[in-house]
Amino acid sequence: MRTRAVQRYSSHAGWLRSVACLTGLLLSLSAGAALKPGARAPDFTTQATLAGQPFTFSLADALKRGPVVLYFYPAAFTSGCTVEAHEFAEATDRFKALGATVIGVSHDPIDTLNRFSVSECRNKFAVASDADKHISKAYDANLFATPYASRTSYVIAPDGSILYEYTALSPDKHVANTLAAVEKWKAAQPRAN
């Protein structure tokens, strides 16, 4: 009897190790695929929502106003994505003071994002729907072999070039890193008289 339990435990532990290794491999494959600084940011127009109000978001139009912080996240209302949305909401005024627009993108339908933009984004910044995954594909931000976007953040300069890219499953450094990249960009701009 005890031998059978040990065999089941060993089999279960082996299966868990295999899943953990595969997950690590998949995450590392998705992490290396993102577009790099200096690359041209693919233009897109999509449905977005701010404070529960749907609108059409155009990257080209947003870049006319300044840099864009484009961040991809796996799914609305999941723990890491909620933490990341709260952190971006808290930092939105700092991004705006630097002339930057923040937009989050996931594969969620716009109805889900209407609620997410109110409760988790706290009416501070827009989130966009990439239900057909064409935007995340163009930015190499699909989490390999899953139906989700990877957690990838970009800072895009007004000229459409990628200034900064960061991919990590943890939401911890996305806001701080993109804010630092926007601050660095702003410091390099000629001062108006």
What are these regions (language model features)?
Residues 2-20:
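Bacterial N-terminal signal peptides that target proteins for export
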Residues 28-30:
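N-terminal signal peptide c-region/cleavage motif recognized by signal peptidases
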Residues 32-40:
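Cleaved targeting-peptide boundary
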Residues 42, 67, 150-152:
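Short loop/turn microsegments at loop-to-beta-strand junctions
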Residues 45-67:
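A short beta-strand-turn-helix
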Residues 59-86:
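Short active-site neighborhood of thiol/selenol oxidoreductases, capturing the structured segment around
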Residues 82-121, 133-135:
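Structural microenvironment flanking redox-active thiols in thiol-disulfide oxidoreductases
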Residues 149-193:
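Thiol-/selenol-based redox modules, centered on thioredoxin-like
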